[in-house]
A protein has these predicted regions:
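Metal-dependent nuclease catalytic cores that hydrolyze phosphodiester bonds in DNA/RNA
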Residues: 1-100, 105-129
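Nucleic-acid nuclease catalytic cores
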Residues: 76-205
Length: 208
């Protein structure tokens, strides 16, 4: 058997998931914000780019599978009144309610996220939440929620659904786990988050 290396030609800058209009994108703003806030965590590097590419590939597969089940679709790009582009994973209507769907794949542990009794059976983690009351995620998930709240603000909906594929589950042992949460934000939460990101774009990045 002869074996030779082969270049995979994957786009390790994460720009291959679809057409991007020229101009400022929402992801540039919140990525810049978190890189400044926690440079050690968001420092980048070759290994992080490989993980990003793998995560993006998983997200595309999940997006295609979930969009039909949610009676939704990937809607393409939206643009804010400031001229900022953003691309939700899924937009679905449940009756007259618009639901923003966001899909993530991560190597972080599911051990500290809100886990309902039913989810506990999937994760192997003791339940820490009843499944309906107010709950919070660990700080390391903040960037997910910044993205979701900014998108929801501009879509004028308080409703979102977050899907997370935990590649290594709770790490004890490393086993994939797929979890989902319905989210409902207050108008204040959405406005506060977008105001902070807009201020960062204006005062720090100086791009709007």
């Amino acid at each position: 058997m002869k074996i030779r290396t082969h270049e995979h030609h994957l786009d390790l800058l994460g720009t291959s998931s679809g057409y991007r209009s020229p101009g400022l994108h929402m992801s540039e703003i919140y990525n810049h914000y978190y890189q400044r806030a926690d440079p050690k965590r968001y420092r980048g590097g070759a290994f992080d780019l490989v993980r990003m590419e793998a995560g993006s590939a998983l997200e595309v597969v999940l997006e295609n599978a979930l969009s039909s089940r949610m009676a939704g679709e990937r809607p393409g790009e939206f643009q804010t009144e400031e001229g900022i582009w953003f691309s939700p994973d899924i937009i679905a209507f449940e009756g007259k309610i618009l639901v923003l769907g966001e899909i993530k794949a991560t190597w972080m542990s599911c051990r500290e996220v809100p886990v309902s009794p039913d989810q506990s059976k999937l994760t192997g983690v003791p339940s820490n939440w009843d499944g309906t009351s107010i709950a919070t995620f660990p700080k390391q998930f903040d960037k997910y929620f910044t993205q979701i709240k900014c998108y929801a603000y501009h879509l004028r909906t308080p409703y979102a659904r977050l899907y997370i594929y935990f590649v290594n589950g709770n790490w004890s042992p490393p086993t994939p786990v797929f979890l989902c949460w319905d989210l409902e934000f207050t108008a204040h939460e959405l406005t506060e988050e977008w105001t902070a990101m807009k201020r960062h774009a204006q005062k720090v990045m100086k791009v709007i």
